[in-house]
């Protein structure tokens, strides 16, 4: 037998032996949190976002939560408590038609509007809107609110969830809108649209173009020249409302001005519920059953009296 052959055989046997999970393994197995199993919550990031210094009492740490669906943008100011997360204020992109923006409710420009609306609404609720007006006109440059003499600026931390934080992501559009609205949020300009990784500087003109929907207008012009049929189908809602690439910036400026003027949430007028026809018998109360029985007895007695008169 060759030297070392037995050791080689034993090594190969060890390699191919399947690891058996014992009864103790399954008995002591602990499942992860439900939202971690579903892939909805990054608890490692959440722990760092909500943990407060132990020498601060009854001082919640607020988070700017930005989430995106296929047709909506959700932005909320939230703080954690033992009983669950508490929402201080919220803004949605489906509210933007009230301010003059009826199309493109999920792009970067709409995300900026939602962040701006949330910031102004939160500060108005806390009666800080006059003291912290924020950046009234968006220029694309980085903006950080300066503390006033009386009250410190409202501070929140950006909660992006599980989204991939690439440069120019819409979640940073919400961040930029909230910053211009007057909320103090620790941030860097490296992820704003228009940041050049080669020069390591933010180009304000490119960022401004995204805030005012310039990237959408450029795509509209490209389709109008190259693929008119696709333009008719892709931008049908824009065409229906007579929105052209040249008047895109003016439209967004009006939306920003309307948000600054009145950021309060508007209650939707809902029609009263219709009264449906009832097919089953209504359940009577005790008093109604008693009155019905008395009426039947009176009817029977009157019928008997009528028969006796005939006889």
Q: Where do the protein language model's features map onto the residues?
A:
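Ribosome-associated RNA-binding proteins
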Residues: 2-7, 11-311
């Amino acid at each position: 037998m060759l030297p070392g052959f037995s050791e080689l055989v034993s090594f190969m046997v060890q390699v191919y032996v399947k690891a058996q999970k014992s009864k103790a393994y399954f008995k002591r197995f602990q499942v992860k949190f439900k939202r971690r199993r579903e892939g909805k919550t990054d608890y490692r990031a959440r722990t760092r976002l909500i943990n407060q210094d132990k020498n601060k009492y009854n001082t919640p740490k607020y988070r700017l939560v930005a989430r995106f669906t296929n047709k909506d943008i959700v932005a909320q100011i939230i703080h954690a408590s033992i009983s669950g997360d508490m929402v201080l204020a919220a803004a949605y992109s489906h509210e933007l038609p009230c301010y003059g923006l009826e199309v493109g409710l999920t792009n970067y420009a709409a995300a900026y509007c939602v962040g701006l609306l949330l910031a102004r609404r939160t500060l108005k609720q806390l009666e800080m809107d006059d003291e912290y007006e924020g950046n009234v006109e968006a220029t694309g440059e980085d903006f950080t609110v300066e503390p006033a003499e009386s009250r410190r600026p409202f501070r929140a931390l950006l909660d992006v969830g599980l989204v991939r934080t690439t440069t120019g992501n819409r979640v940073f559009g919400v961040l930029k809108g909230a910053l211009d609205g007057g909320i103090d949020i620790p941030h860097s300009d490296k992820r704003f649209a228009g940041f050049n990784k080669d020069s390591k500087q933010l180009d304000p003109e490119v960022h401004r173009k995204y805030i005012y929907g310039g990237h959408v207008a450029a795509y509209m012009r490209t389709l109008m020249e190259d693929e008119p049929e696709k333009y008719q189908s892709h931008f049908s809602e824009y065409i229906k409302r007579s929105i052209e690439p040249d008047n895109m910036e003016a439209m967004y400026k009006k939306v920003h001005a309307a948000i600054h003027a009145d950021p309060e949430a508007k209650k939707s007028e809902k029609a009263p519920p219709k009264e449906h026809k009832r097919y089953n018998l209504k359940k009577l109360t005790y008093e109604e059953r008693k009155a019905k029985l008395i009426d039947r007895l009176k009817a029977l007695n009157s019928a008997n009296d009528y028969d006796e008169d005939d006889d």
